[in-house]
Amino acid sequence: MNIEEYRGHCISKKGVTESFPFGKLPDVLVFKVLGKMFTATDISNFEAISVKCNPEDVEHLRETYMAVQPPAYMNKKHWNKIMMDHTVPDSLIKKWIDDSYDLVVKNLSILERHKLNES
C-alpha cells in the first residue's frame, strides 16, 4: 500500500476529514470522523500508520505480526503502529483501518452518529 492508496481508503469513509493538526509535527496527516481521530501517518516517509484497536486485540496483534508495534505518541492500550514494510497484506491493513473507523463511530454519541448518518 502506498500513501495515496492509504489516503484514498481513509477519505472514502463517511464523515471523514483530513488535517495536519500538530504544529510541532507538520508532516503528520490525521484522519478523523466527526473530529475523532481513527488513523494517522507521517507523510514525509510513510513508514508506519497508527490505528485505534480494541484493547483486547492490541497485544494479540503485536504478538502475531512483527509489523505491529506499540505507537510512540499514542495510548498503547488503544492504538497500534503498523509498519508499512509490505509484510502485512494491504487487505488486512485496510481491515484494521476499517475496524479503527468503526470503533470510533461506535463510541460517538447518539446525536453524533445521527449526524453522521445524515451526511
Segments the model singles out, each with a brief description of its role:
Residues 1-119:
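Charge-dense, helix-prone N-terminal extensions
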